[in-house]
Protein backbone atom coordinates (compact mmCIF):
# COMPACT_ATOMS: atom_id res chain seq x y z
CA UNK A 1 0.00 0.00 0.00
CA UNK A 2 1.12 3.58 -0.56
CA UNK A 3 0.91 4.46 3.09
CA UNK A 4 3.51 7.19 2.83
CA UNK A 5 1.34 9.05 0.33
CA UNK A 6 -1.47 8.83 2.86
CA UNK A 7 0.89 10.18 5.50
CA UNK A 8 1.61 13.22 3.34
CA UNK A 9 -2.10 13.87 2.84
CA UNK A 10 -3.00 13.34 6.48
CA UNK A 11 -0.91 16.05 8.14
CA UNK A 12 -2.01 14.68 11.50
CA UNK A 13 -0.06 14.10 14.69
CA UNK A 14 0.34 10.43 15.65
CA UNK A 15 -0.44 9.13 19.08
CA UNK A 16 2.78 9.50 21.09
CA UNK A 17 3.53 6.72 23.59
CA UNK A 18 5.03 7.29 26.97
CA UNK A 19 8.80 7.09 27.47
CA UNK A 20 8.16 4.16 29.81
CA UNK A 21 6.28 2.26 27.09
CA UNK A 22 9.12 2.74 24.62
CA UNK A 23 11.71 1.70 27.19
CA UNK A 24 10.05 -1.71 27.49
CA UNK A 25 10.31 -2.49 23.76
CA UNK A 26 12.82 -5.31 23.07
CA UNK A 27 14.95 -3.88 20.26
CA UNK A 28 17.57 -6.04 18.57
CA UNK A 29 18.96 -6.93 15.18
CA UNK A 30 17.43 -10.03 13.63
CA UNK A 31 20.78 -11.11 12.20
CA UNK A 32 22.16 -13.75 14.54
CA UNK A 33 19.19 -13.55 16.92
CA UNK A 34 17.79 -16.83 18.27
CA UNK A 35 14.00 -16.88 17.96
CA UNK A 36 13.87 -20.62 18.53
CA UNK A 37 12.06 -23.08 16.27
CA UNK A 38 8.60 -24.54 16.79
CA UNK A 39 9.56 -27.74 14.94
CA UNK A 40 10.27 -30.66 17.25
CA UNK A 41 13.50 -32.60 16.65
CA UNK A 42 12.11 -35.81 15.16
CA UNK A 43 13.95 -38.57 13.30
CA UNK A 44 16.93 -36.38 12.50
CA UNK A 45 19.35 -37.94 10.05
CA UNK A 46 23.01 -38.08 10.94
CA UNK A 47 24.34 -34.85 9.45
CA UNK A 48 28.03 -35.36 9.94
CA UNK A 49 30.88 -34.91 10.15
CA UNK A 50 31.55 -37.78 7.76
CA UNK A 51 35.29 -38.20 8.25
CA UNK A 52 37.65 -40.48 6.36
CA UNK A 53 38.36 -42.76 9.33
CA UNK A 54 34.70 -43.79 9.62
CA UNK A 55 34.42 -46.02 6.55
CA UNK A 56 36.13 -48.92 4.84
CA UNK A 57 35.70 -47.49 1.35
CA UNK A 58 33.57 -45.04 -0.57
CA UNK A 59 32.47 -43.95 -4.01
CA UNK A 60 30.30 -41.23 -5.52
CA UNK A 61 27.25 -42.94 -7.00
CA UNK A 62 25.16 -39.92 -8.05
CA UNK A 63 25.82 -36.31 -8.93
CA UNK A 64 23.33 -33.85 -10.42
CA UNK A 65 23.20 -30.40 -11.98
CA UNK A 66 20.86 -27.58 -10.92
CA UNK A 67 17.80 -26.80 -12.99
CA UNK A 68 16.64 -23.24 -13.63
CA UNK A 69 13.20 -24.33 -14.77
CA UNK A 70 10.25 -23.04 -12.71
CA UNK A 71 9.01 -25.35 -9.98
CA UNK A 72 5.59 -25.31 -8.36
CA UNK A 73 6.74 -26.49 -4.95
CA UNK A 74 4.99 -25.51 -1.70
CA UNK A 75 6.42 -22.47 0.02
CA UNK A 76 7.31 -20.33 -3.00
CA UNK A 77 5.83 -18.71 -6.08
CA UNK A 78 4.28 -15.76 -7.86
CA UNK A 79 0.93 -14.59 -6.48
CA UNK A 80 -1.86 -13.58 -8.85
CA UNK A 81 -4.64 -11.62 -7.16
CA UNK A 82 -8.25 -12.50 -7.88
CA UNK A 83 -9.31 -9.80 -5.39
CA UNK A 84 -7.45 -6.93 -3.74
CA UNK A 85 -8.58 -4.18 -1.36
CA UNK A 86 -10.23 -2.31 -4.23
CA UNK A 87 -11.90 -5.42 -5.65
CA UNK A 88 -11.17 -7.66 -8.68
CA UNK A 89 -9.64 -6.49 -11.96
CA UNK A 90 -10.29 -2.93 -13.11
CA UNK A 91 -12.28 -4.28 -16.06
CA UNK A 92 -14.65 -6.12 -13.70
CA UNK A 93 -15.08 -3.02 -11.56
CA UNK A 94 -15.93 -1.00 -14.68
CA UNK A 95 -18.36 -3.61 -16.03
CA UNK A 96 -16.20 -4.62 -19.01
CA UNK A 97 -15.41 -8.14 -17.78
CA UNK A 98 -17.19 -10.82 -15.80
CA UNK A 99 -15.78 -11.96 -12.49
CA UNK A 100 -15.60 -15.52 -13.83
CA UNK A 101 -13.52 -14.44 -16.83
CA UNK A 102 -11.17 -12.44 -14.61
CA UNK A 103 -10.50 -15.39 -12.31
CA UNK A 104 -10.05 -17.82 -15.19
CA UNK A 105 -7.58 -15.55 -16.98
CA UNK A 106 -5.53 -15.04 -13.84
CA UNK A 107 -5.47 -18.77 -13.09
CA UNK A 108 -4.48 -19.50 -16.69
CA UNK A 109 -1.30 -17.42 -16.62
CA UNK A 110 1.55 -19.96 -16.74
CA UNK A 111 3.79 -17.97 -14.40
CA UNK A 112 1.17 -17.63 -11.63
CA UNK A 113 1.60 -20.22 -8.88
CA UNK A 114 -0.79 -19.03 -6.17
CA UNK A 115 -4.14 -17.23 -6.41
CA UNK A 116 -4.59 -14.64 -3.67
CA UNK A 117 -7.71 -13.05 -2.18
CA UNK A 118 -7.50 -9.88 -0.09
CA UNK A 119 -11.02 -8.96 0.95
CA UNK A 120 -12.97 -7.30 3.74
CA UNK A 121 -14.52 -9.09 6.70
CA UNK A 122 -17.94 -8.22 5.22
CA UNK A 123 -17.00 -10.37 2.20
CA UNK A 124 -16.81 -13.54 4.30
CA UNK A 125 -19.44 -13.10 7.03
CA UNK A 126 -22.87 -11.46 7.17
CA UNK A 127 -24.19 -12.73 10.50
CA UNK A 128 -22.81 -14.30 13.68
CA UNK A 129 -22.01 -17.99 13.75
CA UNK A 130 -21.62 -18.73 10.03
CA UNK A 131 -19.47 -17.96 7.02
CA UNK A 132 -21.04 -16.25 4.01
CA UNK A 133 -18.26 -16.26 1.45
CA UNK A 134 -18.64 -13.94 -1.52
CA UNK A 135 -18.60 -15.61 -4.99
CA UNK A 136 -14.92 -14.80 -5.49
CA UNK A 137 -14.04 -17.54 -3.00
CA UNK A 138 -15.65 -20.48 -4.79
CA UNK A 139 -14.48 -19.16 -8.15
CA UNK A 140 -10.89 -18.85 -6.94
CA UNK A 141 -10.79 -22.23 -5.20
CA UNK A 142 -12.29 -23.99 -8.22
CA UNK A 143 -9.88 -22.29 -10.63
CA UNK A 144 -6.90 -23.18 -8.44
CA UNK A 145 -7.93 -26.83 -8.36
CA UNK A 146 -8.56 -26.86 -12.10
CA UNK A 147 -5.19 -25.31 -13.00
CA UNK A 148 -3.00 -26.95 -10.35
CA UNK A 149 -2.49 -23.73 -8.38
CA UNK A 150 -2.81 -22.94 -4.68
CA UNK A 151 -4.71 -20.22 -2.77
CA UNK A 152 -3.77 -17.71 -0.07
CA UNK A 153 -5.85 -14.99 1.53
CA UNK A 154 -6.19 -12.05 3.89
CA UNK A 155 -9.38 -10.86 5.60
CA UNK A 156 -9.26 -7.14 6.46
CA UNK A 157 -10.94 -5.38 9.38
CA UNK A 158 -10.06 -1.99 7.89
CA UNK A 159 -10.00 -0.80 4.30
CA UNK A 160 -9.74 2.78 3.09
CA UNK A 161 -10.88 1.97 -0.46
CA UNK A 162 -14.62 2.30 0.10
CA UNK A 163 -14.78 4.73 3.01
CA UNK A 164 -16.93 6.47 4.07
CA UNK A 165 -19.63 4.70 2.02
CA UNK A 166 -18.63 1.22 3.15
CA UNK A 167 -16.50 -0.10 6.02
CA UNK A 168 -14.68 -3.42 6.06
CA UNK A 169 -16.58 -4.83 9.03
CA UNK A 170 -19.93 -6.57 8.50
CA UNK A 171 -22.97 -4.61 9.61
CA UNK A 172 -23.83 -6.91 12.51
CA UNK A 173 -20.43 -6.21 14.07
CA UNK A 174 -20.45 -2.47 13.39
CA UNK A 175 -23.61 -2.29 15.47
CA UNK A 176 -21.82 -3.82 18.47
CA UNK A 177 -18.32 -2.31 18.35
CA UNK A 178 -17.58 1.39 18.99
CA UNK A 179 -16.30 3.06 15.82
CA UNK A 180 -13.74 5.87 16.06
CA UNK A 181 -13.23 8.78 13.68
CA UNK A 182 -9.46 9.19 13.23
CA UNK A 183 -9.28 12.03 10.70
CA UNK A 184 -10.40 13.46 7.38
CA UNK A 185 -10.37 11.04 4.45
CA UNK A 186 -7.27 11.27 2.29
CA UNK A 187 -6.61 10.31 -1.29
CA UNK A 188 -7.53 6.63 -0.82
CA UNK A 189 -11.11 7.11 0.27
CA UNK A 190 -14.09 6.24 -1.93
CA UNK A 191 -13.24 7.13 -5.55
CA UNK A 192 -10.50 9.43 -4.30
CA UNK A 193 -13.10 11.93 -3.05
CA UNK A 194 -11.57 13.84 -0.12
CA UNK A 195 -14.75 15.75 0.79
CA UNK A 196 -16.93 13.00 2.19
CA UNK A 197 -15.93 12.61 5.81
CA UNK A 198 -13.50 10.87 8.12
CA UNK A 199 -11.72 7.54 8.19
CA UNK A 200 -13.45 5.24 10.66
CA UNK A 201 -11.67 2.53 12.64
CA UNK A 202 -13.10 -0.01 15.10
CA UNK A 203 -12.10 -0.25 18.73
CA UNK A 204 -10.07 -3.41 18.27
CA UNK A 205 -9.81 -3.84 22.03
CA UNK A 206 -13.59 -4.02 22.54
CA UNK A 207 -14.82 -7.42 23.80
CA UNK A 208 -17.38 -7.72 20.99
CA UNK A 209 -14.66 -7.25 18.38
CA UNK A 210 -12.33 -9.72 20.06
CA UNK A 211 -15.07 -12.31 20.43
CA UNK A 212 -16.15 -11.97 16.81
CA UNK A 213 -12.54 -12.13 15.61
CA UNK A 214 -11.96 -15.39 17.49
CA UNK A 215 -15.20 -16.84 16.12
CA UNK A 216 -14.32 -15.84 12.55
CA UNK A 217 -10.89 -17.43 12.80
CA UNK A 218 -12.39 -20.63 14.19
CA UNK A 219 -14.87 -20.80 11.32
CA UNK A 220 -12.24 -20.04 8.68
CA UNK A 221 -9.88 -22.59 10.21
CA UNK A 222 -12.62 -25.23 10.30
CA UNK A 223 -13.07 -24.65 6.57
CA UNK A 224 -9.51 -24.06 5.39
CA UNK A 225 -6.87 -25.10 7.96
CA UNK A 226 -5.00 -28.02 6.42
CA UNK A 227 -6.86 -27.77 3.11
CA UNK A 228 -4.22 -28.82 0.54
CA UNK A 229 -5.22 -25.92 -1.73
CA UNK A 230 -4.42 -23.29 0.91
CA UNK A 231 -0.83 -22.03 0.80
CA UNK A 232 -0.87 -19.49 3.66
CA UNK A 233 -3.19 -17.13 5.53
CA UNK A 234 -2.30 -13.57 6.50
CA UNK A 235 -2.67 -12.76 10.18
CA UNK A 236 -5.71 -10.56 10.75
CA UNK A 237 -3.89 -7.43 11.89
CA UNK A 238 -5.07 -4.01 12.98
CA UNK A 239 -5.08 -0.87 10.86
CA UNK A 240 -5.39 0.11 7.23
CA UNK A 241 -5.64 -2.97 4.97
CA UNK A 242 -4.65 -5.16 7.92
CA UNK A 243 -1.07 -3.89 7.71
CA UNK A 244 -0.60 -2.80 11.33
CA UNK A 245 -0.62 1.00 10.94
CA UNK A 246 -2.91 4.01 10.52
CA UNK A 247 -0.69 5.94 8.09
CA UNK A 248 0.04 8.86 10.36
CA UNK A 249 -3.52 9.20 11.61
CA UNK A 250 -4.20 8.81 15.35
CA UNK A 251 -4.76 5.32 16.66
CA UNK A 252 -8.32 4.35 17.66
CA UNK A 253 -6.93 2.78 20.83
CA UNK A 254 -7.22 4.75 24.08
CA UNK A 255 -3.48 4.35 24.76
CA UNK A 256 -0.39 2.53 23.53
CA UNK A 257 -0.42 -0.09 26.29
CA UNK A 258 -3.97 -1.13 25.44
CA UNK A 259 -2.99 -1.37 21.78
CA UNK A 260 0.05 -3.52 22.53
CA UNK A 261 -1.86 -5.85 24.83
CA UNK A 262 -4.72 -6.20 22.34
CA UNK A 263 -2.53 -6.91 19.32
CA UNK A 264 -0.44 -9.48 21.20
CA UNK A 265 -3.65 -11.22 22.25
CA UNK A 266 -4.93 -11.23 18.66
CA UNK A 267 -1.74 -12.81 17.35
CA UNK A 268 -1.64 -15.48 20.06
CA UNK A 269 -5.26 -16.38 19.37
CA UNK A 270 -4.62 -16.86 15.66
CA UNK A 271 -1.48 -18.91 16.26
CA UNK A 272 -3.51 -21.18 18.54
CA UNK A 273 -6.31 -21.50 15.97
CA UNK A 274 -4.36 -22.23 12.79
CA UNK A 275 -2.35 -25.43 13.30
CA UNK A 276 -1.84 -26.85 9.81
CA UNK A 277 -1.67 -23.88 7.42
CA UNK A 278 1.11 -21.28 7.74
CA UNK A 279 0.17 -17.83 8.98
CA UNK A 280 1.97 -14.77 7.58
CA UNK A 281 2.68 -11.78 9.84
CA UNK A 282 3.20 -8.28 8.47
CA UNK A 283 6.54 -6.81 9.58
CA UNK A 284 5.22 -3.25 9.55
CA UNK A 285 7.33 -1.11 11.93
CA UNK A 286 5.47 0.37 14.87
CA UNK A 287 4.73 3.78 13.34
CA UNK A 288 1.31 3.88 15.04
CA UNK A 289 2.59 2.73 18.46
CA UNK A 290 0.39 -0.35 18.64
CA UNK A 291 2.91 -2.93 19.85
CA UNK A 292 3.93 -4.26 16.45
CA UNK A 293 7.43 -5.13 17.61
CA UNK A 294 6.16 -7.42 20.36
CA UNK A 295 3.46 -8.91 18.15
CA UNK A 296 5.95 -9.72 15.39
CA UNK A 297 8.21 -11.40 17.94
CA UNK A 298 5.29 -13.51 19.19
CA UNK A 299 4.35 -14.47 15.64
CA UNK A 300 7.88 -15.42 14.58
CA UNK A 301 8.43 -17.50 17.71
CA UNK A 302 5.13 -19.20 16.94
CA UNK A 303 6.28 -20.18 13.45
CA UNK A 304 4.45 -17.52 11.42
CA UNK A 305 5.95 -16.53 8.11
CA UNK A 306 6.70 -12.85 7.50
CA UNK A 307 5.54 -10.42 4.84
CA UNK A 308 5.79 -6.82 3.73
CA UNK A 309 3.31 -4.91 1.60
CA UNK A 310 5.96 -2.76 -0.05
CA UNK A 311 9.61 -3.30 -0.92
CA UNK A 312 11.42 -0.13 -2.06
CA UNK A 313 10.07 2.48 0.37
CA UNK A 314 10.42 0.34 3.49
CA UNK A 315 12.38 1.52 6.50
CA UNK A 316 15.85 0.05 7.15
CA UNK A 317 14.58 -1.87 10.18
CA UNK A 318 12.05 -3.81 8.11
CA UNK A 319 14.56 -4.71 5.41
CA UNK A 320 17.00 -6.00 8.03
CA UNK A 321 14.28 -8.12 9.63
CA UNK A 322 13.05 -9.65 6.39
CA UNK A 323 16.54 -10.47 5.14
CA UNK A 324 17.62 -11.99 8.46
CA UNK A 325 14.46 -13.84 9.48
CA UNK A 326 14.86 -17.40 10.75
CA UNK A 327 15.71 -19.41 7.62
CA UNK A 328 12.83 -21.86 8.18
CA UNK A 329 10.29 -19.05 7.68
CA UNK A 330 9.10 -17.91 4.25
CA UNK A 331 8.86 -14.23 3.28
CA UNK A 332 6.11 -12.75 1.09
CA UNK A 333 6.71 -9.46 -0.73
CA UNK A 334 4.52 -7.11 -2.69
CA UNK A 335 4.43 -3.47 -3.75
CA UNK A 336 1.25 -1.73 -4.82
CA UNK A 337 2.82 1.38 -6.33
CA UNK A 338 2.82 0.04 -9.90
CA UNK A 339 0.25 -2.69 -9.38
CA UNK A 340 -1.38 -2.34 -12.81
CA UNK A 341 1.75 -3.65 -14.60
CA UNK A 342 1.09 -1.19 -17.43
CA UNK A 343 4.30 -1.81 -19.39
CA UNK A 344 4.16 1.21 -21.78
CA UNK A 345 3.90 3.60 -18.82
CA UNK A 346 6.88 2.25 -16.88
CA UNK A 347 9.98 4.38 -16.57
CA UNK A 348 13.25 2.82 -17.70
CA UNK A 349 16.56 3.80 -16.09
CA UNK A 350 19.94 4.43 -17.71
CA UNK A 351 20.74 0.71 -17.51
CA UNK A 352 17.58 -0.15 -19.44
CA UNK A 353 15.86 -1.61 -16.36
CA UNK A 354 12.19 -0.74 -15.89
CA UNK A 355 10.83 0.36 -12.51
CA UNK A 356 8.91 -2.81 -11.78
CA UNK A 357 11.81 -5.08 -12.63
CA UNK A 358 14.01 -3.04 -10.31
CA UNK A 359 11.40 -3.48 -7.57
CA UNK A 360 10.89 -7.21 -8.03
CA UNK A 361 14.57 -8.16 -8.24
CA UNK A 362 15.00 -6.84 -4.69
CA UNK A 363 12.97 -9.89 -3.68
CA UNK A 364 16.15 -11.91 -4.24
CA UNK A 365 18.15 -9.54 -2.02
CA UNK A 366 15.70 -10.32 0.79
CA UNK A 367 15.96 -14.10 0.18
CA UNK A 368 12.20 -14.12 -0.18
CA UNK A 369 9.79 -16.82 -1.35
CA UNK A 370 6.90 -14.95 -2.98
CA UNK A 371 6.27 -11.89 -5.14
CA UNK A 372 2.80 -10.47 -5.76
CA UNK A 373 1.48 -9.68 -9.24
CA UNK A 374 -1.87 -8.02 -8.39
CA UNK A 375 -5.06 -8.23 -10.47
CA UNK A 376 -4.45 -7.24 -14.10
CA UNK A 377 -3.94 -10.51 -15.98
CA UNK A 378 -3.82 -9.04 -19.50
CA UNK A 379 -1.28 -6.43 -18.44
CA UNK A 380 0.76 -9.12 -16.71
CA UNK A 381 0.91 -11.19 -19.89
CA UNK A 382 1.89 -8.12 -21.93
CA UNK A 383 4.48 -7.08 -19.36
CA UNK A 384 6.06 -10.53 -19.36
CA UNK A 385 6.20 -10.52 -23.16
CA UNK A 386 7.89 -7.11 -23.24
CA UNK A 387 10.13 -7.56 -20.19
CA UNK A 388 10.57 -11.32 -19.64
CA UNK A 389 13.74 -11.10 -17.54
CA UNK A 390 12.11 -10.13 -14.24
CA UNK A 391 9.70 -13.03 -13.82
CA UNK A 392 12.26 -15.45 -15.29
CA UNK A 393 14.90 -14.47 -12.74
CA UNK A 394 12.47 -14.77 -9.87
CA UNK A 395 11.24 -18.17 -10.98
CA UNK A 396 14.81 -19.45 -11.33
CA UNK A 397 16.06 -18.23 -7.94
CA UNK A 398 13.23 -17.20 -5.62
CA UNK A 399 12.54 -19.39 -2.60
CA UNK A 400 14.32 -22.73 -2.21
CA UNK A 401 15.49 -25.11 -4.98
CA UNK A 402 16.88 -28.33 -3.52
CA UNK A 403 18.54 -31.31 -5.15
CA UNK A 404 20.91 -34.13 -4.14
CA UNK A 405 24.03 -32.70 -5.74
CA UNK A 406 26.22 -35.58 -4.52
CA UNK A 407 25.34 -38.99 -3.13
CA UNK A 408 28.14 -41.17 -1.77
CA UNK A 409 28.01 -44.83 -0.85
CA UNK A 410 30.30 -45.81 2.03
CA UNK A 411 31.23 -49.17 3.56
CA UNK A 412 30.36 -48.73 7.22
CA UNK A 413 29.24 -50.96 10.10
CA UNK A 414 29.33 -53.95 7.76
CA UNK A 415 26.77 -52.47 5.38
CA UNK A 416 26.26 -49.57 2.98
CA UNK A 417 25.76 -46.00 4.14
CA UNK A 418 24.31 -43.43 1.75
CA UNK A 419 25.41 -39.83 2.35
CA UNK A 420 23.43 -37.23 0.41
CA UNK A 421 24.62 -33.65 0.01
CA UNK A 422 21.42 -31.70 -0.55
CA UNK A 423 22.18 -28.38 -2.23
CA UNK A 424 19.88 -25.38 -2.34
CA UNK A 425 20.32 -23.12 -5.36
CA UNK A 426 17.49 -20.85 -4.28
CA UNK A 427 18.00 -17.71 -2.24
CA UNK A 428 15.86 -18.82 0.73
CA UNK A 429 16.16 -21.56 3.29
CA UNK A 430 13.66 -24.41 3.27
CA UNK A 431 10.46 -22.97 4.84
CA UNK A 432 10.10 -25.71 7.40
CA UNK A 433 11.88 -29.04 7.74
CA UNK A 434 13.15 -31.08 4.78
CA UNK A 435 12.48 -34.81 5.03
CA UNK A 436 14.35 -37.34 2.89
CA UNK A 437 13.15 -40.84 2.04
CA UNK A 438 15.34 -43.64 0.67
CA UNK A 439 13.07 -46.33 -0.72
CA UNK A 440 13.47 -49.49 -2.77
CA UNK A 441 11.16 -49.87 -5.79
CA UNK A 442 9.25 -52.70 -4.10
CA UNK A 443 8.79 -50.65 -0.92
CA UNK A 444 10.47 -53.23 1.33
CA UNK A 445 13.13 -50.67 2.23
CA UNK A 446 11.63 -47.37 3.34
CA UNK A 447 14.01 -45.20 5.35
CA UNK A 448 13.07 -41.64 6.37
CA UNK A 449 14.71 -38.84 8.25
CA UNK A 450 14.86 -35.08 8.50
CA UNK A 451 17.40 -32.29 8.37
CA UNK A 452 17.53 -29.38 10.80
CA UNK A 453 14.84 -26.68 10.28
CA UNK A 454 15.57 -24.42 7.32
CA UNK A 455 18.43 -26.56 5.99
CA UNK A 456 19.85 -26.42 3.48
CA UNK A 457 19.87 -22.64 3.69
CA UNK A 458 19.80 -20.54 0.54
CA UNK A 459 22.89 -21.04 -1.65
CA UNK A 460 24.17 -23.69 0.76
CA UNK A 461 24.10 -27.44 1.27
CA UNK A 462 23.47 -29.93 4.07
CA UNK A 463 24.55 -33.55 4.39
CA UNK A 464 22.48 -36.40 5.76
CA UNK A 465 22.93 -40.17 5.78
CA UNK A 466 21.03 -43.46 5.75
CA UNK A 467 22.27 -46.92 6.76
CA UNK A 468 20.90 -49.54 4.37
CA UNK A 469 20.05 -53.11 5.42
CA UNK A 470 22.99 -55.48 5.12
CA UNK A 471 23.55 -56.89 1.69
CA UNK A 472 21.22 -54.57 -0.21
CA UNK A 473 22.26 -53.96 -3.82
CA UNK A 474 20.20 -52.28 -6.52
CA UNK A 475 17.98 -49.25 -6.98
CA UNK A 476 17.11 -46.76 -4.27
CA UNK A 477 14.73 -43.89 -4.96
CA UNK A 478 15.52 -40.68 -3.10
CA UNK A 479 12.55 -38.46 -2.39
CA UNK A 480 11.94 -35.14 -0.59
CA UNK A 481 9.10 -33.68 1.44
CA UNK A 482 8.76 -30.44 3.36
CA UNK A 483 7.24 -30.27 6.82
CA UNK A 484 5.68 -26.88 6.29
CA UNK A 485 3.95 -26.84 9.69
CA UNK A 486 4.54 -29.28 12.55
CA UNK A 487 3.38 -32.72 11.33
CA UNK A 488 2.13 -31.33 7.99
CA UNK A 489 4.21 -32.72 5.11
CA UNK A 490 4.01 -31.91 1.40
CA UNK A 491 5.96 -33.43 -1.51
CA UNK A 492 8.82 -31.46 -3.07
CA UNK A 493 10.14 -31.86 -6.62
CA UNK A 494 13.93 -31.96 -6.91
CA UNK A 495 15.36 -28.95 -8.77
CA UNK A 496 17.79 -30.88 -10.96
CA UNK A 497 18.18 -31.29 -14.70
CA UNK A 498 18.40 -35.08 -14.48
CA UNK A 499 15.08 -36.90 -15.10
CA UNK A 500 12.85 -37.69 -12.14
CA UNK A 501 10.52 -40.62 -11.61
CA UNK A 502 6.76 -40.15 -11.81
CA UNK A 503 6.58 -39.76 -8.03
CA UNK A 504 9.23 -37.01 -8.06
CA UNK A 505 12.01 -39.24 -6.75
CA UNK A 506 15.51 -39.63 -8.17
CA UNK A 507 16.95 -43.11 -8.68
CA UNK A 508 20.45 -44.20 -7.73
CA UNK A 509 22.21 -47.57 -7.91
CA UNK A 510 23.64 -49.10 -4.73
CA UNK A 511 26.84 -50.99 -5.60
CA UNK A 512 27.89 -54.46 -4.37
CA UNK A 513 30.74 -54.74 -1.90
CA UNK A 514 33.00 -56.21 -4.59
CA UNK A 515 32.42 -53.36 -7.06
CA UNK A 516 35.77 -52.33 -8.64
CA UNK A 517 35.19 -48.60 -8.10
CA UNK A 518 35.54 -48.44 -4.31
CA UNK A 519 38.11 -45.92 -3.09
CA UNK A 520 40.10 -45.87 0.13
CA UNK A 521 43.31 -44.05 0.99
CA UNK A 522 43.46 -42.47 -2.45
Where is each model-derived feature located?
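N-terminal export signals
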Residues: 5-23
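Non-catalytic accessory regions flanking glycosidase/transglycosidase catalytic cores in CAZymes
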Residues: 26-114, 135-139, 143, 225, ...
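Catalytic-core regions of glycoside hydrolase
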Residues: 34-101, 111-113, 145-149, 231-243, ...
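Aromatic-lined substrate-binding rim segments of carbohydrate-active enzymes
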Residues: 109, 117-183
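The substrate-binding groove and active-site-proximal loops of carbohydrate-active enzymes
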Residues: 121-131, 197-211, 252-257
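An active-site-proximal structural segment forming one wall of the substrate-binding cleft
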Residues: 140-145, 198-232, 262, 266
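Active-site-adjacent "subsite" loops/lids of carbohydrate-active enzymes
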Residues: 159-219
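Extracellular/luminal regions of secreted and cell-surface proteins that mediate adhesion/ECM remodeling
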Residues: 396-522
